[in-house]
């Protein structure tokens, strides 16, 4: 997925496959372009068909941790063919609300993030207290996954991840699932005591329950 768009700051913006296809959109951030790439992969799987791929495109899940946790969340939000999204420790720009992160210290907030991952205009327009002028925030990004399944995983041992900003974002987003009476399709878990991007045993049952229920169509308790 990294090959679709800009991965690190020293990689020149506008020189990746997405940018060559859509040069007028070169100011887009990498996350929207990576999500576009995932959608094209799903297009290919659907075109080839299950006989060739042995993949049921009605049961596609996407997951990732850290920057890839952000990537998973964007992919799940923007493609309705993704049945299950599991975003592990996605940090700022993932599930954490920018407005809340601005009130915290030592976290990935809008003034301290990798701007090659987002629109170039974001820092110029919404730096400092201007963050409160954002027309949207990331509880809405999470809610875009609804009515499909979403699981958010946090790790409070890494302050940079801004789980204090992810929690209210997740709580706000889950109200959308609750409104439709499908609250079993969304959950979140914040557990410490383990390295970054390592799934602890305490979270494994919840992860397995989401996989069982939304990818394998088995009975499982997700709330």
Where are these regions (language model features)?
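C-terminal catalytic histidine-bearing segment of alpha/beta-hydrolase fold enzymes
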Residues: 171-172, 176-223
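Alpha-helix capping and helix-loop boundary segments enriched in small/acidic/polar residues
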Residues: 25-32, 62-63, 73, 128-136, ...
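Extended catalytic-interface subdomain
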Residues: 33-44, 62-65, 87, 121-155, ...
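Primarily recognizes the serine-hydrolase "nucleophile elbow" in alpha/beta-hydrolase
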Residues: 39-105, 130
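Conserved strand-to-loop "acid loop" that flanks and positions the catalytic carboxylate
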Residues: 146-164, 192-193
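Solvent-exposed loop/turn segments at secondary-structure junctions
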Residues: 2-5, 67-69, 91-93, 156-159, ...
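Mobile cap/lid helix-loop segments that gate and shape the active-site cleft of serine hydrolases
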Residues: 50, 87-141, 162-170, 178-183
């Amino acid at each position: 997925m990294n090959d679709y768009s800009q991965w690190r700051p020293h990689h020149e913006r506008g020189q990746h496959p997405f940018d060559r296809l859509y040069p007028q959109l070169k100011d887009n951030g990498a996350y929207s372009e990576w999500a576009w790439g995932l959608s094209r992969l799903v297009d290919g799987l659907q075109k080839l068909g299950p006989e060739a791929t042995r993949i049921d495109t009605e049961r596609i899940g996407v997951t990732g941790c850290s920057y890839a946790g952000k990537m998973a969340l964007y992919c799940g939000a923007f493609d309705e063919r993704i049945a299950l999204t599991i975003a592990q420790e996605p940090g700022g720009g993932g599930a954490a609300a920018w407005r809340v992160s601005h009130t915290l210290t030592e976290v990935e907030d809008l003034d301290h993030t990798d701007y090659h991952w987002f629109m170039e205009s974001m820092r110029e327009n919404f730096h400092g207290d201007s963050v409160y002028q954002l027309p949207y925030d990331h509880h809405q990004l999470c809610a875009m996954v609804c009515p499909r399944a979403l699981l958010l995983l946090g790790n409070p041992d890494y302050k940079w991840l801004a789980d204090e900003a992810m929690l209210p974002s997740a709580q706000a987003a889950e109200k959308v699932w609750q409104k439709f009476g499908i609250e079993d399709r969304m959950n979140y878990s914040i557990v410490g005591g383990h390295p970054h991007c390592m799934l602890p045993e305490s979270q494994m049952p919840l992860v397995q329950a989401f996989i069982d229920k939304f990818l394998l169509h088995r009975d499982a308790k997700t709330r």
